[in-house]
Amino acid sequence: MAVITKIDTFAAIGAGVIGSGWVARALANGLDVLAWDPAEDAEMQLRANVENAWPALERAGLAPGASPARLHFVPTIEACVADADFVQESAPEREALKLELHERISRAAKPDAIIASSTSGLLPTDFYARAHRPERCIVGHPFNPVYLLPLVEVLGGERTAPDTVDAALGIYRALGMRPLRVRKEVPGFIADRLLEALWREALHLVDEGVATTGEIDDAIRFGAGIRWSFMGTFLTYTLAGGEAGMRHFMQQFGPALELPWTKLVAPKLTDALIDRVVEGTAEQQGPRSIKALERYRDECITEVIAAIAAVKARHGMRYED
């Protein structure tokens, strides 16, 4: 099966937070972008999101020809995907909706176009069941903000051709991303399963009055979060084992896994818990608008990525190492 390996035109189906992030990343890489979303104010919100993201993208570095002027908002799905080399769907996480969307997308798209979904946990075998030419359909699950964070989880369904996955990995790399091939179809894939465990424990700590939302965020951002930005969980614990490494760590701290510290099951989302979380995060946000916080976040991300890349280069490493 022939699939596209180099793209010039990128189609975005859905223009919410994730979809607009894809649009901004594609524009920053010098592509022509077509976008569609059924919401009445979708085009206005999309252009506002791209405008808010652009200063961070300029700091990170734009490809030749990159411009928000290369974004075209169109009235139908068919107009969006007909001439696209790569289609990225970022619709709400409802399987029935994605089944319907991908039936339409796949019939209107070019035969060799790659079709991807941003789903964070639905399985491609299921929601591509009615797709035309499902061998060119994949999942490309990004992380917010999509235009800055490099990770994208990539996997196919039972009928996806291996060549399609390989081509998608290359295209995402060309967009400045760090694609991670997911070896098996599992709900939640890799990163969100890890984040979900942390999120559940955080909610338990708030619910039981152990800590506020701000204190929990501080525990992450002044502790493990700093290490995680350049050295993940397993390598961090390898160092904790000293010269003997991971085997010593597992022998010394492995029994602690049996201690009943964590809850793991989701807490009941009572009105009281929801109110406590909302009030806590409102206090953290203070008078700053969401757009202002996004700009602050984006500047932090670009500076952190640049700093890590510089240190790795001095140690003879690539950023993705």
Swiss-Prot record:
Extract the Pfam families matched here: 3HCDH, 3HCDH_N
Q: Which residue stretches, if any, does this entry annotate as coiled coil? A: none
**UniProt keyword rRNA processing, yes or no:** no
Q: What is its EC number?
A: 1.1.1.108
One record GO biological process: catabolic process
Question: What's its top-level EC category?
Answer: oxidoreductase
Report the pathway entry.
Answer: Amine and polyamine metabolism; carnitine metabolism
Q: Which UniProt keywords apply?
A: Cytoplasm, NAD, Oxidoreductase
Q: Which GO terms describe its molecular function?
A: carnitine 3-dehydrogenase activity; NAD+ binding
- According to its UniProt record, where is this protein located? Cytoplasm
* Oxidoreductase keyword on record: yes
Q: Which domain of life is it from?
A: Bacteria
Looking up HAMAP family in the UniProt record yields: L_carnitine_dehydrog (MF_02129)
Q: What does this protein do?
A: Catalyzes the NAD(+)-dependent oxidation of L-carnitine to 3-dehydrocarnitine.
The name this protein goes by in its record? L-carnitine dehydrogenase
Highest classification ranks of the organism: Bacteria, Pseudomonadati, Pseudomonadota, Betaproteobacteria, Burkholderiales
